[in-house]
Amino acid sequence: MALLQISEPGMAPAPHQRRLAVGIDLGTTNSLVAAVRNSVPEVLPDEAGRVLLPSVVRYLEKGGRRIGHEAKEQAATDPRNTIVSVKRFMGRGKAEVEGAANAPYEFVDAPGMVQIRTIDGVKSPVEVSAEILATLRYRAEDTLGDELVGAVITVPAYFDDAQRQATKDAARLAGLNVLRLLNEPTAAAIAYGLDNAAEGLYAVYDLGGGTFDLSILKLTKGVFEVLAAGGDSALGGDDFDHALFDHVLAQAGIDAKTLAPEDVRLLLDRVRVLKEALSSAPEAALDVTLSSGAHLAPTISHDTFASLVEPLVQRTLTPTRKALRDAQVTPADIKGVVLVGGATRMPVIRDAVAKYFGQPPLVNLDPDQVVALGAAIQADLLAGNRGTGDDWLLLDVIPLSLGVETMGGLVEKIIPRNSTIPIARAQEFTTFKDGQTAMAIHVVQGERELVADCRSLARFELRGIPPMTAGAARIRVTYQVDADGLLSVFAREQQSGVEASVVVKPSYGLADDDIAKMLEDSFKTAEIDMRARALREAQVEAQRMLEATQAALAADGELLDADERAQVDALADALRAVAQGDDTNAIEAATKALADGTDEFAARRMDKSIKRALSGRRLDEI
C-alpha cells in the first residue's frame, strides 16, 4: 500500500506565503546551495544527504555529462574531459591561464574568454559553471517544492568586472534569476554577524580552493559596512596541493612534464588527501603507482609541509596588510577574525592568522558553509521575505579602481577602490586637437598608472562633438557601479547634449549572441537532461520501496503464508533486477507492481498495530 508522505510541522512549502530564493556559493573546489526555512538559514543536501557538491563536470560523447561526486570519482581516469577548479578560468583569456599549474586540458585560443576542448566539443568556463549552478538549482527546487524566484550568488571580493560578468552569464545559462552578486567575505560576515549579534571591527580571511580574499568590516547594529577589501584571485588551496605535488615529484626525480594527464590528476587527488591528513596528524604517507610503473611512497611531516607552503602563506598576508592600511586600522583594532573556505582548516593557516592578528581566529561556524548561509539570508531579504529583526543594511565596496585612458596611455581613476557600492562618479574631460569631433572612451580597471598595466573593460566612442579649439569642449564622463559590482559608463558633451553610453561587457565576458547560442544548445539537450533526471528519480523511488519492503518483511513476515511471501520476494527481485538499469518505464512499472502486490500485507500490518494498541483496554478508555 502506497503511503502518503506528510512533512514535519512548519516544514511544508507555502509558495503563496513566501517567495523562494536561495544563496549559492559557487566555489573552486565545492559548491553549496542554502535557503532560509522557518527563519533559519540552512544548507540544502542532495538525496544522499551530502551538502557539498564537488565543482567538477565530466563531458561524455553525444551530449552526456556527469556533475559533482560522480565526475570527481572519474577525474583521474578521464582528466582531459573532466573539468575541475573551473572558477580559476572564469573571465580569463588564454594567455592568463595557459600556465595553469599541471592543467591537463587543451585550451582553445578563441576570441574572448579561454575555452577548453572536450570529447563533447569546445566548452567555455561559463558553460561548465552553468552545469554546476543548474544542478544546485534542481536540488533547491526539489527540496523546497517549488520554482525559485532568484538566487544570490557569491563571488570573491577581488573578482574583477570580467569575472563577475562571467558568473552572471553562467547563472543566466543555468536558468537562474540573479538577485545579487555578493562578495564572499561579506556573505560570511552576514552569517556570522546575525548569528552572533556581533559588533565592532572584523576581518574576514577567506581562502578557498582557488581564490583568496581579505575584507575588513565594521559591524554595528543593523549595518554591515565593508571598509576595505584585498586579495588574490589566483591563490587558493589548489596552490598548496601543487606545492606538495612538486615536492613529491622532485624527491622521486620525476619531471612533471613527462607525466601523462591521468597521472597528474591521480597524483593531485592523492596529495590533496595527504594535505588534509596533515591537518590532524604530525605526518602522513603517500602511496601511489603511476602508469609508468613508478611507485611513490614518501612520508611527509607537517613541518616539511609547513616549510613548503610558507611562501603561499606569506602571499595571503600581503593583501591582508594592504587592506588594513586602506581601512586605516591595525591588527590590534580587530575584534575578531572570521575564517572562510575549506583551506583555512590547515593548522599552518590558523597559526599564521593567530600570530598576525594576535588572537585565535573564530571557528564556530563551518568555513565550508558560512558563505552560502550568508547568501541565503540576503536572498531571502531580497525576495521580499522580510521578517522581525531583518532591518539591516549592507554596504559593500568595489575591490579595484575604475578609470579611463587619457592621452599618453595614462589612467585617470574615476572611482577609487574600496568605494561603497552602488555608486556613481563623474569627471569632465576635454578634446586634444582643434576641431576634434569625436572622442574614444577606453574603460579600464586596476591600480596601476599605465593603461598597459591595467585590465581593459570596454571601449566606445562619443561622436558629434561640435568643432572647437582644443580644450574648449566639455565632456562629462559618468561611471555607475550597481550593487552587483557591474559597471555602466555614460559620456555627454555639455554644449550640444550629444551622448553615448555602454553597459560594460568585458572583452572576456560573453556576447549576447554567445549566450543565446548556449541557451539554444541547452534547449537541445533539455530532453536528455529530463530523461536522466526521470531515471534517477525512478531509481531512488525503487530503492526506497525495496528498503521499506525488506524492513516490513523482517518485522512482520509471519503475516504472510509461504505462497504470499514467495510472490512478494519475486516482485522485489524483479524490481531489484531493473533498478540499476536505464529503462525508466521498466523501473516505474516494477515499483508499482511491488507496491500493488504488498497492499494486502500493508493492511494486515495496520490491523496488527491497531490490535496491539487496543489490547487490554476497556471501551470507555478509548
Curated annotation (Swiss-Prot):
Record-level Gene Ontology MF annotations: ATP binding; ATP hydrolysis activity; ATP-dependent protein folding chaperone; unfolded protein binding
UniProt xrefs under SUPFAM superfamilies: Actin-like ATPase domain (SSF53067), Heat shock protein 70kD (HSP70), C-terminal subdomain (SSF100934), Heat shock protein 70kD (HSP70), peptide-binding domain (SSF100920)
InterPro entries: ATPase_NBD, Heat_shock_70_CS, HscA_NBD, HSP70_C_sf, HSP70_peptide-bd_sf, Hsp_70_fam, ISC_FeS_clus_asmbl_HscA
Gene Ontology biological process terms, A to Z: iron-sulfur cluster assembly
Domain of life: Bacteria
Family membership: Belongs to the heat shock protein 70 family.
Protein name: Chaperone protein HscA homolog
